[in-house]
């Protein structure tokens, strides 16, 4: 048997693993062969790619410079009136340029040398030839008119892009619809996440449901109820899933109802005689507002006049989940007027009556994470705090007629502040636009002193960029839905307005404005047909129609038509009616039962009337005493003193 030397490599060794070794180790192979790389080829490919990229960049830059030079030349030609000499000069210059270019390309040189000016000169806009791309540094002839039209299109595109970048053009205010809630202030607005239903609440205790898909042009609510009886509605908000609505009223107990208005749960009322509000199971004073958690289903928050902010769960209405107690810098109680969650739900923000804004971590209820004590004027009700969609900025609407913007990451001073925004209601709203570039709030006015406005501020510069005059009443609530791109406004005269743009908005009010109002069915009535016969006899002639007033006076005299009640019966009753003893049967019976049957006659005189007849004709008593006692004897009258003397000792009164 021959064995190969150590320097020899067999084909089996190079092709794959040893079969005997594979059988011994229990596997079929050693995997894929290691990949080899040719570094020189890779380096050459990288170099070529870099050169090609640099060449393209240089060509694009040179082409842009050439276009700029052509534009300048075209402007100069437009300013100067064309003459034959000038046209010839331009033509000669273009021809000389073509000759210079022909050094690199013979075809172009032959074509340009044959091109000569024959006849009158052409207009400046038609003078030109193909752009020479061989040498970018040489100024070529004028471009054709099609290039100018393309440049105009580019300018229009740039203008359209500028309009899209301007946030004012995104405000949907071209059209509006008005929903009649009532006659009193609309103090609460809520829109579900899908934008299908709107719910409104007001000072008239009513909560009304509006379905955009089910409404027609009459704009009528499909349901109205009073969930909190005689308490004003202060806040309405749909949950993040849209199946429940949080109702906050002037009472101390918040309620949760479903989409159809049926009650799901009611928070318990706390013990108002306990000093520490953390030991009570619920609020003990009037509520201000409430808010759903943006991430956790079934969790919501309320704030009250008992100086607490409480977190609740729908599954446990008998006790709150946690309690936040706002405090002043001196540790005293302070009433929160509004509260909200951050966009991620990790922070809880509340504004208080002393002008401070306090922000807690949701899991740490003792000390606030951020506390700014002079955010607004002390003693005023801050009506709203709202987080931006990115979660970094907080907007606050103060009762001191200001709107301020805060950075949560540096909560030591306001970023911007806007004044001269009057407010008269403790629930005036402020909100961010869906693209986070605008901030919206409403203004209040006295009755008959102007119109309420919806004011838009740019977030980056905080300049007042736009205003919408709503109505001759205060603007209380405002809501900008991100999916519908529609703005809902609640006013002080009982109206809820919806602003939209057919090109920028989706669904919502667009679904109901296209539906025609249903016509009411007229009841069919049969009227008497009058036949006018002027030559008929008077006995068959029908009486003329009198005026309504005269007909009513005539009907009044008729006891049957006027339903005149029967007069009372004088004297004894007749026809089944009781007479003078009363108008009803019960009074007659009472009078007969309570009759006074006392006899006022003297009994002695009544007996003495028969004394002479008894003496002349004795029958009963006198014959019995005629023999034994013929002479009548009467008892002697004794005084009271003698009677008392004859009494025994044990009966005498002791003095």
UniProtKB/Swiss-Prot annotation:
Domain of life where this protein originates: Eukaryota
Record's keyword annotation contains Phosphoprotein: yes
Keyword tags: Acetylation, Isopeptide bond, Phosphoprotein, Repeat, Ubl conjugation, WD repeat
The keyword Repeat is assigned to this record: yes
Compositionally skewed regions (Acidic residues) per UniProt: 148-165
Annotated positions of the Phosphothreonine modification: 580
Residue(s) carrying Phosphoserine: 622, 639
UniProt feature, compositional bias: Low complexity: 99-112
Transmembrane segments: none
PROSITE patterns the record matches: WD_REPEATS_1, WD_REPEATS_2, WD_REPEATS_REGION
GO MF annotations, alphabetized: enzyme binding
WD repeat extents: 181-220, 228-269, 282-322, 331-370, 377-416, 422-467, 470-509
Any one annotated GO CC term: site of double-strand break
Covalent cross-link (Glycyl lysine isopeptide (Lys-Gly) (interchain with G-Cter in SUMO2)), residues: 297, 591, 597
Matching InterPro entries: G-protein_beta_WD-40_rep, WD40/YVTN_repeat-like_dom_sf, WD40_repeat_dom_sf, WD40_rpt, WD_repeat_GAD-1
Residues bearing PTM N6-acetyllysine: 453
Biased composition, class Basic and acidic residues, residue ranges: 45-78, 541-566, 645-655
Family annotation (Pfam families): WD40 (PF00400)
Compositionally biased tracts (Gly residues): 572-582
Stretch list, region Disordered: 1-24, 43-170, 541-582, 632-655
UniProt similarity note: Belongs to the WD repeat GAD-1 family.
Family matches, as PANTHER family: GASTRULATION DEFECTIVE PROTEIN 1-RELATED, WD REPEAT-CONTAINING PROTEIN 70
Name assigned to this protein: WD repeat-containing protein 70
Origin species: Rattus norvegicus (Rat)
Gene behind this protein: Wdr70
